[in-house]
Design a protein with these regions (language model features):
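Phosphate-backbone binding interfaces of nucleic-acid-interacting proteins
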Residues: 1-113
């Protein structure tokens, strides 16, 4: 387990629900990655992420799926892609990511608490 944080620190992390609207391979990445565009609703808009999630996910099965992401990290250039959000998932001992999803469809942009 990582070191404990306070509720005030956790509360600074802006975690939101969004819907994937486009997916394509990041051809410039050293490790297989996808460029994922996510619609977070009117307040935040559409943001993109470069994500190493190709073991289970591709354009066909990810487009239209709701995901959960950290929206207030600084932008980061990853293999020529400006990554604006961090899509959340569990990572197993081999580095394979399983995305976190809501159990029911909900409005884009809703905060996760």
């Amino acid at each position: 387990m990582k070191e404990q944080i306070t509720y005030d620190i956790f509360n600074k992390v802006d975690i939101r629900l969004g819907t994937v609207i486009s997916v394509k391979k990041n051809e410039n990445a050293r490790k297989p990655s996808l460029v994922v565009e996510v619609d977070f609703g009117k307040e935040i808009g559409i943001k993109q992420s470069s994500a190493q999630i190709t073991h289970y996910y591709n354009e066909e099965n990810l487009k239209g799926k709701q995901v959960i992401a950290v929206c207030n990290f600084p932008e980061k250039n990853i293999a020529g892609v400006v990554s604006q959000v961090l899509i959340l998932g569990s990572v197993d001992s081999e580095g394979i990511v399983t995305l976190v999803h809501p159990s029911q469809k909900a409005d884009n942009g809703l905060p996760i608490a």
